């Protein structure tokens, strides 16, 4: 289905696809809620705090997330803002789900980094920034929780620059903090935006004034705090570098805004910055060539699979990032890995757990495809061309458990459940060749809890996890059939097959792995597997 190039260019230019990265509890889910509120996607923001009411945050839609108040899976939300279409991918803030987050960052064109003003740059933010660095992702920064006592803003900027190695250009500067938070001064507009308490869950007109020196502002802050503000503002203005769009697009410079997501203050400025500076959908690499967003032929890749988004339907949805062309309902596309043509007439668009049938989608959009076990993470879909999008990895897990079933009659349901949940990519299943064990691998302990909970809730299977003497796993590859056969014979007791049918080596210790690598230099022991 060809699309008019003019229409396509217009639609591409309107789109912004981004993710929020932060350390747990920096306010990411609250920010997501408020962004949706500004996009008029939800009428009253469901606060994350407390969790005593029935109103859970829109983006935390799975039952375990709602019980525990942590974002575990990546939610996808689309909303309009000022004549643009914004696609927001919410990522898990918990460290155990870094793989899911990593893959999500392959599907976005920019990221919003949230920093807790009281805590500064935290460990998880550093890790996520490393991932963004590898992909030169443009970063917008938001220092959150100004309605509480925060650290000295100059100190925070210095920390972001030194720890994360990215130049900061403040867009706004805070006037006071905590109980005395008055608002922010916009450095390029020479305007003050005044903060009003108690309007966190709604959109209200924000009062603005030219300049910043007003008697009531001085009075609210007190003379001492006001002169401290003036002093820090002067220092910032003296040291301020001009915002360089090229450096921003390379991920080397970040505009910094201050505010409070809970108080819904500064959120619209984030959206305005996103619309003004963040790039529209970019080109994507494949093994064959670079695919540009404005190409008229449809293409896209799957970066995530989610089982049981709707427990009533027992379904699996593959999340596909559109890279070029246009999706139209009922169109025929090629599932490249299988070499098969499929007709897609039931693709979905999302607002977290809510889904709607989709008529059309453009580059930058995320669409949901119903998956009956044939789609894997990393799969490419095109309008016929042999293209394989690259850079969507599987990481070697760091923790392993043997899965023990409480009711042996449920083994079929257990296998199905583990297979489907591992397709999501947060855990991996290994089947040793020596016995009938099922070994589950993950990057963090929380994932085992999540799997046990979801097996019980969604598949009615109860199981326990036992420790197992596996230190690490490596994917095996060897071009020489004779050497591979020799290796398989010698290493038989340590070999297994993963959920995708790939040969793996389960190393009982790091020393053992090293010895095997030395003994078989022609065999590749890889700690990642590209999809």
From Swiss-Prot:
Belongs to the TRAFAC class translation factor GTPase superfamily. Classic translation factor GTPase family. PrfC subfamily. The keyword Zinc does not apply. GO terms for cellular component: cytosol. It holds the Pfam family RF3_C. It is found in: Cytoplasm. The keyword Translocase does not apply. This is Peptide chain release factor 3. The lineage of its organism: Bacteria, Pseudomonadati, Pseudomonadota, Gammaproteobacteria, Moraxellales. Increases the formation of ribosomal termination complexes and stimulates activities of RF-1 and RF-2. It binds guanine nucleotides and has strong preference for UGA stop codons. It may interact directly with the ribosome. The stimulation of RF-1 and RF-2 is significantly reduced by GTP and GDP, but not by GMP. GTP binds at residues 22-29, 90-94, 144-147. Keywords: Cytoplasm, GTP-binding, Nucleotide-binding, Protein biosynthesis. Residues 13-282 form the tr-type G domain. It comes from the Bacteria. It comes from Psychrobacter sp. (strain PRwf-1). One of its GO terms (biological process) is regulation of translational termination. InterPro entries: EF-G-like_DII, EFG_III/V, G_TR_CS, P-loop_NTPase, PrfC, RF3_C, RF3_dom_3_sf, RF3_GTP-bd. GO terms for molecular function: GTP binding; GTPase activity; guanosine tetraphosphate binding; translation release factor activity, codon nonspecific; translation release factor activity, codon specific.
């Amino acid at each position: 289905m060809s699309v008019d190039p003019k229409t396509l260019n217009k639609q591409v230019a309107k789109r912004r696809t981004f993710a929020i990265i932060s350390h747990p509890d920096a306010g990411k889910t609250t920010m997501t809620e408020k962004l949706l509120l500004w996009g008029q996607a939800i009428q009253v923001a469901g606060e994350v705090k407390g969790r005593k009411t029935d109103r859970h945050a829109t983006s935390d839609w799975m039952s375990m997330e709602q019980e525990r108040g942590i974002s575990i899976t990546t939610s996808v939300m689309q909303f309009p803002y000022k004549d643009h279409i914004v696609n927001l991918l919410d990522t898990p803030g918990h460290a155990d789900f870094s793989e899911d987050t990593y893959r999500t960052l392959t599907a976005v064109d920019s990221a919003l980094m949230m920093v807790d003003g009281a805590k500064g740059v935290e460990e998880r933010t550093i890790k996520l920034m490393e991932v963004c660095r590898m992909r030169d992702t443009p970063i917008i920064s938001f220092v959150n929780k100004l309605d509480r006592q925060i650290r000295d803003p100059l100190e925070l900027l210095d920390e972001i620059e030194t720890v994360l190695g990215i130049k900061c250009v403040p867009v706004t500067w805070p006037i006071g903090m905590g109980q005395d938070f008055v608002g922010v001064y916009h450095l390029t507009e020479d305007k003050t935006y005044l903060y009003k308490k108690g309007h966190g869950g709604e959109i209200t007109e924000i009062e603005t004034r030219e300049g910043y020196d007003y008697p009531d502002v001085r009075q609210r802050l007190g003379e001492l705090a006001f002169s401290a503000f003036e002093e820090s503002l002067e220092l910032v203005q003296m040291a301020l570098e001009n915002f360089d769009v090229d450096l921003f697009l390379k991920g080397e410079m970040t505009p910094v805004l201050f505010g409070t997501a809970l108080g819904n203050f500064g959120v619209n400025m984030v959206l305005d910055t996103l619309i003004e500076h963040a790039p529209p959908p970019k080109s994507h690499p494949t093994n064959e060539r670079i695919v540009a967003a404005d190409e008229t032929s449809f293409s896209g890749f799957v970066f995530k699979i989610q089982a049981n988004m709707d427990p009533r339907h027992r379904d699996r949805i593959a999340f596909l990032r559109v890279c070029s062309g246009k999706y139209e309902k009922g169109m025929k596309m090629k599932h490249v890995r299988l070499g098969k043509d499929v007709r897609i007439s039931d693709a979905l668009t999302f607002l977290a757990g809510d889904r709607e049938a989709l008529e059309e989608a453009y580059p930058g959009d995320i669409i949901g495809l119903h998956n009956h076990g044939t789609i894997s993470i990393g799969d490419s879909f095109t309008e016929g061309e042999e293209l394989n999008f690259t850079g969507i990895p599987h990481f070697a897990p760091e923790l392993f458990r043997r899965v023990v079933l409480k009711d042996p009659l449920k083994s079929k349901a257990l296998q199905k459940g583990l297979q489907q949940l591992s397709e999501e990519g947060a855990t991996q299943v290994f089947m040793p060749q020596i016995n009938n064990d099922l070994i589950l691998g993950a990057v963090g302990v929380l994932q085992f809890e999540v799997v046990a909970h979801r097996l019980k809730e969604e598949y009615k299977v109860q199981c326990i996890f036992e420790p197992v003497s596996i230190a690490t796993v490596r994917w095996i590859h060897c071009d020489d059939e004779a050497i591979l056969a020799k290796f398989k014979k010698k290493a038989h007791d340590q070999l297994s097959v993963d959920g995708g049918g790939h040969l793996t080596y389960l190393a009982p210790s790091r020393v053992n792995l090293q010895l095997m690598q030395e003994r078989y230099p022609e065999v590749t022991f890889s700690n990642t597997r590209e999809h």
